């Protein structure tokens, strides 16, 4: 499985993410064991990290945060998300496609 995968039907991008909460800033770190490592500032408490991740990705891809689907890993650091019809693809992610 790839860290970033372009999906045709429905059109979008599937991300396999290793999430690092409690970071000093929000950023895409790079690849980590065939997953995209993303660091966020939120604490992993009561879904705050997931909400912050969705907000961060919605800004990067220029899509509404409600459209991003958390497919797997709600309570884990290893997550799988689907971003439907992104308006913009960040250069760090474009390089992995």
Curated annotation (Swiss-Prot):
Disulfide links within the chain: none
Pfam families: DUF167
InterPro entries noted in UniProt: DUF167 (IPR003746), YggU-like_sf (IPR036591)
Any single GO CC term annotated in Swiss-Prot or TrEMBL for this entry: cytoplasm
Domain of life: Bacteria
Sequence similarity: Belongs to the UPF0235 family.
Protein name per Swiss-Prot or TrEMBL: UPF0235 protein APL_1380
Organism: Actinobacillus pleuropneumoniae serotype 5b (strain L20)
